[in-house]
Design a protein with these regions (language model features):
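Divalent metal-dependent catalytic cores for phosphoryl transfer on phosphate-bearing substrates
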Residues: 62-167
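Alpha-helix boundary/capping residues
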Residues: 39-40, 115, 171, 185
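Alpha-helical scaffold segments in carbohydrate-active enzymes
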Residues: 55-58, 150, 187
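Charged phosphate-binding loop/patch that engages nucleotide di/tri-phosphates or the phosphate backbone
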Residues: 172-193
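Intrinsic structural disorder/low-complexity segments
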Residues: 51, 82, 118, 187-188, ...
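Short alpha-helical interface patches
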Residues: 12, 33, 148, 158-170, ...
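Acidic/His-rich, divalent-metal-binding segments that scaffold phosphate/diphosphate chemistry
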Residues: 2-90, 98, 123-125
């Protein structure tokens, strides 16, 4: 297991080459966290991803519908793998490319792609400079990870109304993302036992 940042340096270069060539497979790693580290995610991003994964699992365990808990766990862990390349809105698109190169299943790649905010419409995607398509979470697992991500800032967990106020500060009170987040909250609250 890699512990020091200087110990990872040779591995990071090797992983970068293997990612570009498409020959890497995550079976070579002892854990999913090592995949994040090898992909180049900072310790802050890794800590955030762990927190989101834990929050998402907590949500999944508290609902009265059947979901794939392992997919939720891994989706929470890998949702921000694209932040190894960019911290901009394009990190989801970058994460999709990384996930595909790593051989992630489509269900996991979809979580990475659709986790931004409470989802992004095709119209908003174009405005943000993303490829024109909907980035709206569709499956329960996608919605749970997206929602959990919205409730975690760094590693600090927030309640819905605190997160909503934060969204309003960042996006403005009339942004379509606010309505999507409120709708997402009500949908997930409806699943809770």
């Amino acid at each position: 297991m890699l512990k020091k940042s200087q110990d990872r340096a040779p591995y990071a270069k090797l992983i970068e080459i293997q990612l570009k060539s498409g020959i890497i497979h995550n079976a070579m790693f002892d854990s999913d966290v090592e995949v994040l580290i090898a992909a180049g995610c900072s310790s802050d991003v890794v800590a955030h991803c762990k927190a989101v994964s834990n929050r998402a699992l907590s949500i999944a365990r508290g609902i009265n519908v059947v979901v794939d808990h392992d997919l939720v766990r891994r989706g929470g862990l890998f949702h921000d793998i694209g932040r190894s390349k960019t911290h901009g809105i394009g990190h989801a698109v970058a994460g999709v490319a990384i996930g595909r190169n790593l051989g992630f299943p489509n269900e996991l790649v979809n979580i990475i792609e659709r986790h931004i905010g409470a989802g992004i419409t095709a119209r908003e995607a174009v405005r943000l400079g993303l490829p024109e398509k909907d980035y709206l979470p569709r499956t329960m697992e996608e919605k749970i990870v997206s929602y959990a991500d919205n409730l975690v800032s760094g590693t600090r967990e927030m309640q819905f109304y605190e997160a909503l106020d934060r969204f309003k500060e960042i996006l403005g009170p009339d942004h379509e993302g606010i309505e999507l987040f409120i709708k997402q909250h009500h949908e997930i609250q409806g699943w809770i036992t």
